[in-house]
Amino acid sequence: MEVPSEIIQKLDILQNLIKKWNKSINLISDNTIPNFWQRHILDSLQLMQYISNKEIHLVDIGSGAGFPGIVLSIAGVAKVSLIEADLRKCIFLEKASKISNNSIQIINQRIEKIEIDCNILTCRAFSNLNTIFNCTQNISVREKFLLLKGKNYLTEIVKAKEKWLFDYLIHQSITCRSGKILEVNNLTKII
């Protein structure tokens, strides 16, 4: 994946900020710091290949350390809303948002209470599909969900299909053999 040097510089600033804040609020596992670029930055950046138009509104739920939301904003997504319930992490996200030239809104609330419209909804290391779909019912997602998932993605799909109708594509992660990107659209709850 080719990344312009200006973006790499901003992502380096983000990395240093995360390392500094991680000592006090545990944004990422210490075990992932040696592979920070692959584990966090590239894992987030790979979503750009599924975003055809950067002039969109993207909502990232359970934003934590800003993956993938802040990374996607730095990479050029025009408007990003980061939803995070933990106030300490929101304070970090506010600082980190200054690295991007694009619009970033920090929302310190539980996801279930948010009513917002967006083109794309993302999350990483958040929860299973049923939980994601349940807690985002008040969020109007016009295009798709882009969800970074691990090895249990098939089980999650099967369980979610019991309560939800949706179309999906499975893309291989470029950073982890067992990782997948689920591209979900046409989501409807089964009554």
Curated annotation (Swiss-Prot):
S-adenosyl-L-methionine binds at G62, F67, I111, E112, R124. SUPFAM superfamilies: S-adenosyl-L-methionine-dependent methyltransferases. It catalyses: guanosine(527) in 16S rRNA + S-adenosyl-L-methionine = N(7)-methylguanosine(527) in 16S rRNA + S-adenosyl-L-homocysteine. Signal peptide: none annotated. One of its GO terms (molecular function) is rRNA (guanine-N7-)-methyltransferase activity. GO terms for cellular component: cytosol. InterPro entries: rRNA_ssu_MeTfrase_G (IPR003682), SAM-dependent_MTases_sf (IPR029063). The keyword Repressor does not apply. Gene3D superfamilies: Vaccinia Virus protein VP39. Its EC number is 2.1.1.170. Keywords: Cytoplasm, Methyltransferase, rRNA processing, S-adenosyl-L-methionine, Transferase. It is found in: Cytoplasm. Transmembrane segments: none annotated. It holds the Pfam family GidB. Specifically methylates the N7 position of guanine in position 527 of 16S rRNA. Belongs to the methyltransferase superfamily. RNA methyltransferase RsmG family. PANTHER family: S-ADENOSYL-L-METHIONINE-DEPENDENT METHYLTRANSFERASES SUPERFAMILY PROTEIN (PTHR31760:SF0). This is Ribosomal RNA small subunit methyltransferase G.
